[in-house]
């Protein structure tokens, strides 16, 4: 799977259908695990500020450009990515695959009523999925949840704890369920369960989901600042990387008489 670097992270350069097909043939059909990060500008900016988090993201098998801000900055630095791959779209696409292939899936994250409603919808709309287990995101002992996941032998693990917690969790415990495709999904359970409304198709088609979220929840304006902050930080990093570095060696071209 082709990737392109933005700052220190290698982003998948593909589109949703091709990526899911690659996951299906190379991982799901082979019972091979993978760690997938769905990185929006907030995650990208946090990684630039936090070396430990950056290292965790870099350990993932795939980093997806989940956010038009990531795609936009890729074009500005001359490394254009083909498409945004939204975490929610990946989630529903993988549910389709799990339904078709009778896969075992574990769901972890969100509030108790949200995870309960998520499981209820999965049972209704994806009857072929075998629910390996689930847990809300407020269990204090994460190792307890990790052991529960391991014991359930899932084919897929969806973790919706929000960044950076979901990535730290998968990175720390994926060795307990090495056969599973594990994905960090942010607030996807909230949308899937109907507790949060996703942007109408018009906003999605024109890459304006951020505007819809801001219009419907003005309190998010501080989070929206991550987009220009990320773009500015990446451009600054690219300019610094492009500058020639003085090696300390100067060739003596003087004429000796």
Curated annotation (Swiss-Prot):
Pfam families in UniProt: Glyco_tran_WecG (PF03808)
Name the chain's protein. N-acetylglucosaminyldiphosphoundecaprenol N-acetyl-beta-D-mannosaminyltransferase
Under catalytic activity, the entry for this protein gives: UDP-N-acetyl-alpha-D-mannosamine + N-acetyl-alpha-D-glucosaminyl-di-trans,octa-cis-undecaprenyl diphosphate = N-acetyl-beta-D-mannosaminyl-(1->4)-N-acetyl-alpha-D-glucosaminyl di-trans,octa-cis-undecaprenyl diphosphate + UDP + H(+)
Q: Which GO terms describe its molecular function?
A: N-acetylglucosaminyldiphosphoundecaprenol N-acetyl-beta-D-mannosaminyltransferase activity
**Which UniProt keywords are present, listed alphabetically?**
Cell wall biogenesis/degradation, Glycosyltransferase, Teichoic acid biosynthesis, Transferase
Q: Which InterPro entries match?
A: TagA_TarA, WecG_TagA_CpsF
Q: What does the sequence similarity comment in the record state about its family? A: Belongs to the glycosyltransferase 26 family. TagA/TarA subfamily.
What EC number(s) has UniProt assigned to this enzyme?
2.4.1.187
């Amino acid at each position: 799977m082709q990737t392109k670097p933005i700052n220190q992270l290698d982003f998948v350069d593909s589109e949703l259908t091709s990526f899911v097909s690659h996951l299906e043939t190379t991982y799901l059909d082979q019972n091979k695990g993978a760690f997938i990060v769905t990185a929006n500008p907030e995650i990208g900016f946090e990684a630039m500020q936090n070396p430990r988090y950056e290292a965790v993201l870099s350990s993932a098998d795939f980093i997806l450009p989940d956010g038009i801000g990531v795609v936009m900055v890729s074009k500005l630095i001359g490394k254009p990515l083909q498409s945004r791959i939204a975490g929610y779209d990946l989630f529903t696409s993988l549910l389709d695959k799990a339904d078709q292939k009778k896969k075992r899936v574990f769901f972890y994250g969100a509030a108790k009523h949200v995870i309960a409603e998520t499981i209820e919808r999965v049972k209704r709309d994806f009857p072929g999925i075998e629910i390996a287990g689930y847990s809300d995101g407020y269990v204090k002992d994460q190792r307890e949840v990790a052991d529960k996941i391991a014991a359930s032998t899932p084919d897929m693990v969806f973790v919706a704890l929000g960044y950076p917690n979901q990535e730290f969790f998968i990175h720390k415990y994926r060795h307990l369920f090495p056969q599973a495709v594990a994905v960090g999904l942010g607030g996807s359970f909230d949308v899937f369960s109907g507790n949060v409304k996703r942007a109408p198709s018009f906003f999605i088609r024109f890459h304006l989901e951020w505007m819809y979220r801001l219009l419907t929840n003005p309190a998010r304006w501080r989070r929206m600042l991550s987009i220009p902050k990320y773009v500015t930080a990446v451009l600054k990093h690219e300019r610094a990387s492009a500058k020639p570095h003085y090696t300390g060696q100067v060739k003596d071209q003087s004429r000796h008489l």
